[in-house]
Amino acid sequence: DGFQLVHSDARLHPHLNLEKRITVVGYMNKGWVSEDTGYLEFWTDDMKECWKQVEPKFNRVVIFENSEFSNHGIPHVNKDRRVFMYTLLCNETFYETRTKAWYKARPEEENHDLVNEIGVKRLKLSDY
């Protein structure tokens, strides 16, 4: 469905021992309109403000650094989105060596069971 909890990505690939540095997301959604939703959101570290929403328009590319402060997610999707994603991995480690994503609740989700349940399940399912 495209829904994605706000999180900062895992920093270290669990098998390759390479640090995830940069993420590139490209949108291929011809005919997308704002009612389709699926905005990529970026949040402050304290989760008090969504400082940027990116519309998944056709031919749009988003590039962002992966760090413990790059909180991002997709709150709601009305229509399937088509995206490609590329991740730059480096063999030098500048940040912490976390192999799991950190999930964070948006202000309206703070005590929401679904957020806690999905976050815990995803942490258990995947190391990257």
Feature-to-residue mapping (PLM):
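Catalytic core of Fe(II)/2-oxoglutarate
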Residues: 11-22, 30-128
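Charged, often glycine-rich, active-site loop that binds/positions anionic groups
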Residues: 1-12
